[in-house]
Amino acid sequence: MEPSFKLSSGHKIPLVGFGTWKAETTLVGKAVEVALDAGYRHIDCAAVYLNEKEVGEAFTKKFTTEATVKREDVFITSKLWNTFHKKEHVRPALERTLSDLGLQYLDLYLVHWPVAFEYTSNDIQTSGSTQEFVSIRETWEEMEKLVDAGLVKSIGLSNFNVQGLMEVLSYARIKPAANQVELHPFLSQPELKKFCDKHNIHLTAYSPLGNGAFVDNEEVGAIAKKYNKTIPNVLCKWAIQKNFSVIPKSSTPSRVAENFDLFNFEIEEADMLFLDKMDKNLRTCDPAKFWGVPLFN
């Protein structure tokens, strides 16, 4: 049985998910089908990935046409994009995501970034956008209403640091159940983990493979060889043993299945400590570089 973590909302999140970031529209549907067939029961989506319609087609095929997987057995996450932080835009943005995914509800809906862009249309804008001040409180209060309406089961945040989390906790009627951030041995974020553990906020690791940073790493390679596993297996298992959920991504069917092969081994404590000590604050997804917004400095 795949391990899961009970969120503060009372719902369980499976610790191994399938990520759809940077997945090409022509490949993502098949990849999601392969993931569900391989046993994944946690699929991570976002409006800004511009592939939710294709993911939705895979859901319809598996949940309805073939009826090989039950909707209620799959934990599905999506995210509110930066352009839709104003209170009048939050619910319509979710409704577009639900329509694209072919779903009645989401298991988890996240505020994708603690940054708001100026709203110009319902189209997703990623670059050249003007920042606009919208308080996270305004956005969060609308997120809470989505839970009240039964459209989402849990709500959370993404890319929030300790300061941002403290702010939301100070006024939240419904506390954030999760915070999705970049996490891997080169960026293990111990202070963030400590804070989230204390406040029962679950951490999901995106880019758990470090966006290729570990491909030729001999030390992690040696650990992988010891357990007769791949480097991605070791990186994901490291995260799971720290109670993070992970959302590795791949469009290669064999690799999709391989990345799920995590439940027949345990990393020994000495190796876990060795991986912990590799931390060098290497952030591969930094808005200071692509938006000029130093969120993490």
Curated annotation (Swiss-Prot):
Record keywords, A-Z: Cytoplasm, NADP, Oxidoreductase
Binding site for NADP(+): 10-19, 207-259
Active site: Y49
Catalytic activity: an alditol + NADP(+) = an aldose + NADPH + H(+)
InterPro entries named among the record's database cross-references: AKR, Aldo/ket_reductase_CS, NADP_OxRdtase_dom, NADP_OxRdtase_dom_sf
GO cellular component: cytosol; phagocytic vesicle
Enzyme class: oxidoreductase
GO MF term (any one): aldose reductase (NADPH) activity
EC numbers for this chain: 1.1.1.21
Positions bound to substrate: H112
PROSITE patterns for this protein: ALDOKETO_REDUCTASE_1, ALDOKETO_REDUCTASE_2
Subcellular location: Cytoplasm
Function in brief: Catalyzes the NADPH-dependent reduction of a wide variety of carbonyl-containing compounds to their corresponding alcohols with a broad range of catalytic efficiencies. Probably affects several metabolic pathways in addition to converting glucose to sorbitol. Affects group size.
Family membership noted in the UniProt record: Belongs to the aldo/keto reductase family.
Name assigned to this protein: Aldose reductase A
Lineage: Eukaryota, Amoebozoa, Evosea, Eumycetozoa, Dictyostelia
Name of the gene encoding the protein in the UniProt record: alrA
